[in-house]
């Protein structure tokens, strides 16, 4: 019996993967080389994917997971938090030059999403 899920890429990103299949959206952190630590780009992409999943009437459930394992040591990590290597003295700076990490907006979207959200850790 084939248990492979036929995920289809919903949108291309650099720091996350975003796929859909049969009413389920899968958003995964995709920076295993840094234990899936997030940076401003990661949160911007996460917010964009969460908004898309919210607006897509064919989606009833959103899975949040992570890619891996780390190419350094083979260890799997869901997310290690903010990437301290890109954090400056003034905090995180987004691609637009604004000082922020904007993770609170991602948390708000998850909390108030009118669909089931599951962290696959």
Each predicted region: which residue ranges?
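Conserved CoA-thioester-binding segment of acyl-CoA-metabolizing enzymes
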Residues: 1-69
